[in-house]
């Protein structure tokens, strides 16, 4: 297999099958954006890449190539080849790429070949694959009907979506639940990685027999992850389904999400004492983030109730007081905001109903 190259026509198959990719770009490039199925095994480290880049600007390509060879030579070169070979041994069907599928890809492939290891490199590299995924996102709204799932905070939209083959879970991809209290313990990925993962999820969805693309009715920003503008515009024009749930069920669901799950997660990560401190800070800082919209008086009332609930939780292992501030937050903040937004899209509402009724409606939509 002399100088095997993976053609651009195979990008779709690579993403759908989560084909293992050896990314030989520098760590700083990988950190800015990468694909979920890739592993960073750089040809050059950040400092080496910077020196070669400076040399290229000052003295041209040949001087830069010569410098690269002098920087990655001897034991350093051998270590990198061994790391690549080890990866290929664990992933025999691996491909490799650099940023553009150019010199770094070709050199890495050549060094591996000299070591007796054959690995194809991907035509166009990361840049071309990234452009392909951007195109997937831009084209997705035209592929099939788009439906937007709306509903009051705590009505269980995410739980519902996870049960439907028509759905793509935007909040799961963003690693954020969308609301002011929506952050998770692990930080969100970069904007580029969010877009890459969204595109791959859309590709996977297109292989199903779903009759529509079902998405949660999101703001432009999900935490700090921004929906691509053309995709967001299509969502804003989509027909709407409204999921309904009782207030009691909403309260219990939010207590479980905001309190029980987050507290358990922080304690598991940090231990009981530091975990409770981090959990308390998560709640209080989430409230601070909407202080201006609440107003000083309302914020203070909620903060006092929240602190009382935290005190009761740590002293009595009782989370019942959390229901008080959550209830107030719903009725004074989230619900009025939701009802205002729903009024602006009332003409696009196709159906309103409970979880069961919504499942039945979508099942019938699937067979139309």
Swiss-Prot record:
Active site per database record: 98
Enzyme class: transferase
GO biological process: tRNA wobble uridine modification
Residues covered by the Rhodanese domain: 15-138
Transferase keyword on record: yes
CDD domains on file: RHOD_YbbB
Enzyme Commission code: 2.9.1.3
Stored Pfam families: Rhodanese
Catalytic activity: 5-methylaminomethyl-2-thiouridine(34) in tRNA + selenophosphate + (2E)-geranyl diphosphate + H2O + H(+) = 5-methylaminomethyl-2-selenouridine(34) in tRNA + (2E)-thiogeraniol + phosphate + diphosphate; 5-methylaminomethyl-2-thiouridine(34) in tRNA + (2E)-geranyl diphosphate = 5-methylaminomethyl-S-(2E)-geranyl-thiouridine(34) in tRNA + diphosphate; 5-methylaminomethyl-S-(2E)-geranyl-thiouridine(34) in tRNA + selenophosphate + H(+) = 5-methylaminomethyl-2-(Se-phospho)selenouridine(34) in tRNA + (2E)-thiogeraniol; 5-methylaminomethyl-2-(Se-phospho)selenouridine(34) in tRNA + H2O = 5-methylaminomethyl-2-selenouridine(34) in tRNA + phosphate
InterPro entries on file: Rhodanese-like_dom, Rhodanese-like_dom_sf, SelU
GO-annotated molecular function: transferase activity, transferring alkyl or aryl (other than methyl) groups; tRNA 2-selenouridine synthase activity
SMART domains: RHOD (SM00450)
Keywords assigned: Selenium, Transferase
Superkingdom of source: Bacteria
Record-stated family: Belongs to the SelU family.
HAMAP family: tRNA_sel_U_synth
Function of the protein: Involved in the post-transcriptional modification of the uridine at the wobble position (U34) of tRNA(Lys), tRNA(Glu) and tRNA(Gln). Catalyzes the conversion of 2-thiouridine (S2U-RNA) to 2-selenouridine (Se2U-RNA). Acts in a two-step process involving geranylation of 2-thiouridine (S2U) to S-geranyl-2-thiouridine (geS2U) and subsequent selenation of the latter derivative to 2-selenouridine (Se2U) in the tRNA chain.
UniProt subunit comment: Monomer.
Name of the featured protein: tRNA 2-selenouridine synthase
Record organism: Shewanella baltica (strain OS155 / ATCC BAA-1091)
Encoding gene, per UniProt annotation: selU
């Amino acid at each position: 297999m002399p100088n095997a190259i993976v053609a651009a026509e195979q990008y779709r198959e690579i993403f759908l099958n989560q084909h293992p990719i050896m990314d030989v770009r520098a760590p700083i490039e990988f950190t800015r954006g990468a694909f979920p199925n890739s592993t960073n095994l750089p040809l050059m480290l950040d400092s080496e890449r910077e020196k070669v880049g400076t040399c290229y600007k000052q003295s041209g390509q040949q001087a830069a190539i010569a410098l690269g060879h002098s920087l990655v030579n001897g034991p350093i070169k051998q270590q990198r080849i061994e790391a690549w070979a080890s990866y290929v041994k664990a992933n025999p069907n691996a491909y490799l790429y650099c940023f553009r599928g150019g010199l770094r890809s070709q050199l890495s492939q050549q060094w591996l070949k000299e070591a007796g290891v054959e690995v194809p490199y991907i035509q166009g590299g990361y840049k071309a694959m990234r452009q392909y995924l951007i195109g997937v996102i831009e084209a997705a709204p035209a592929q099939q009907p788009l439906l937007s799932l709306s509903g009051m905070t705590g009505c269980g939209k995410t739980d519902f979506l996870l049960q439907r083959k028509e759905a793509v879970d935007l909040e799961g991809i963003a690693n954020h639940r969308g609301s002011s209290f929506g952050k998770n313990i692990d930080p969100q990925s970069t904007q580029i990685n969010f877009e890459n993962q969204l595109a791959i999820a859309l590709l996977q969805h297109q292989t199903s027999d779903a009759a529509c693309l079902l998405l949660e009715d999101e703001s432009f920003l999900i935490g700090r992850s921004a929906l691509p503008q053309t995709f967001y515009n299509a969502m804003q024009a989509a027909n709407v389904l409204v999921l309904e749930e009782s207030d009691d069920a909403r309260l219990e669901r939010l207590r479980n999400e905001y309190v029980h799950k987050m507290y358990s997660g922080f304690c598991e990560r940090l231990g009981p004492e530091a975990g409770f401190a981090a959990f308390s800070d998560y709640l209080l800082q989430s409230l601070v983030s909407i202080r201006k919209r609440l107003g000083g008086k309302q914020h203070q009332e909620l903060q006092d109730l929240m602190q009382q609930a935290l005190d009761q939780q740590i002293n009595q292992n009782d989370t019942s007081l959390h229901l008080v501030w959550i209830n107030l937050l719903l009725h004074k903040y989230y619900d009025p905001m939701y009802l205002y937004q729903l009024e602006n899209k009332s003409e696009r509402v196709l159906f309103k109903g409970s979880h069961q009724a919504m499942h039945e409606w979508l099942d019938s939509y699937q067979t139309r």
